[in-house]
UniProtKB/Swiss-Prot annotation:
One of the GO BP terms on file: L-serine biosynthetic process
Induction: Induced by sulfate, part of the yoaDCB operon.
Coiled coil, from the record: none
Keywords from the named record: NAD, Oxidoreductase
Organism: Bacillus subtilis (strain 168)
Similarity comment text for this entry: Belongs to the D-isomer specific 2-hydroxyacid dehydrogenase family.
Enzyme active site: 251, 280, 300 (proton donor)
Protein's UniProt name: Putative 2-hydroxyacid dehydrogenase YoaD
Positions with a binding annotation for NAD(+): 193, 275
Domain of life: Bacteria
Signal peptide extent: none
Enzyme superclass (EC): oxidoreductase
């Protein structure tokens, strides 16, 4: 880590391949010296490993800010001058963190950057599902309204969100932001999260089974880990109310696909709102879910707002200022701080 800290105080170039607004880039210039901006958006895809190495070498970069590129052990080995990596994602899943830690390189990330975006889309999609907005919109466009006004009034009469019990599986930044927005609807919030030790003053901590059995809406907010793969299966779906809705905006693989397909086809629950799939773009097996009439599906859009890019700039620049200014590893958004403290 000493070499990393020493390099940090010299004027350096930061290669930025993530979308980064002009104000954020100016802050980086003031902080480090210069910025080489090569956003992946310019070519419409992430840089390949060889392209990333070439870019880092061509720009003499000693810092990297990325969003999509795979930052592998080979990248670190090829560019030993790297002093930090910033990742504009909720988890630095595209970076070989162990390889970075071994070399004393801190990896920063931006948890919660899309919390507001996902929370707003959750509210919108749930209301759309409850009020049959998508179906009624298509029905109207298809010219089906051929009787009096009561035809649609009766056919698409739905339910209100207000007063519903909403269960959260995982209660991190996104889950808590959703809960905050739901207070405007007088919803009761129950959450399951084994990593939150203390009870929340406003919301009810509950077991996984209780969240599924008591909720009108169950929403999943879990990362992909060995622990969560296939966690949500038939034993939990069978606990849900027949009128309940299942929502997944996190990762498809935390849910057993066949079990979800069964309960939807058999109308064991009211339906599902899905923004993530087992293959993206979807394959035939995914379309079996997507095409069901009681599924509201969107193409992984929950975090897709322009403001999310502003949020990750704010979060990352704040961390980098603290790291450089205070010469500290005690930064909440430094993902591998514990490994660096113990020597990798």
């Amino acid at each position: 880590m000493k070499n990393t800290m020493k390099r940090m105080f010299c004027s350096m170039t930061v290669l930025v391949t993530a979308p980064y607004n002009e104000e954020g880039r100016k802050e980086l210039e003031n902080l480090f010296g210069s910025v080489a901006y090569q956003s992946w958006k310019e070519q419409g895809r992430a840089y390949r490993e060889d392209e990333l190495i070439q870019l880092l070498k061509a720009t003499n970069a000693t810092g990297l800010i990325t969003e999509l590129d795979q930052v592998t052990d080979s990248v670190f080995a090829s560019v030993p001058e790297l002093s930090f990596v910033g990742v504009c994602r909720g988890m630095p899943s595209n970076v070989d963190v162990a390889a970075a830690s071994k070399r004393g390189i801190p990896v920063f990330y931006t948890p919660g950057r899309n919390a507001q975006a996902v929370a707003e889309m959750f509210i919108g999609n749930v209301i759309s599902f409850l009020r049959h907005t998508s179906a009624s919109n298509q029905w109207l466009k298809d010219g089906e309204w051929d009787s009096d006004y009561l035809q649609a009034y009766v056919k698409f009469k739905g339910n209100e969100l207000t007063g519903k019990t909403v269960g959260m599986i995982g209660f991190g930044a996104v889950g808590q932001r959703i809960a905050k927005l739901l207070t405007a609807f007088d919803c009761k919030i129950k959450y399951y999260d084994p990593y939150i030790q203390d009870d929340h003053p406003l919301y009810e901590k509950a077991s996984l089974k209780t969240v599924f059995s008591d909720s009108d809406i169950v929403s999943v907010h879990l990362p992909r880990t060995e622990e969560t793969l296939g966690l949500i299966d038939r034993q939990y779906f069978d606990l849900m109310k027949e009128s309940a809705i299942f929502v997944n905006t996190s990762r498809a693989v935390v849910v057993n696909r066949e079990d979800l397909l069964f309960v939807l086809k058999e109308h064991k629950i009211s339906g599902a709102i899905l923004d993530v799939f087992y293959h993206e773009p979807p394959e035939e097996s995914d379309y079996e879910l997507i095409s069901l009439p009681n599924v509201l599906a969107t193409p992984h859009l929950a975090g897709a707002t322009f403001e999310v890019e502003d949020h990750h700039v704010t979060i990352l620049n704040k961390a980098l200022k603290k790291w450089k200014g205070e010469k500290t590893l005690n930064i909440q958004t430094m993902y591998n701080k514990d490994a660096l403290k113990t020597g990798g």
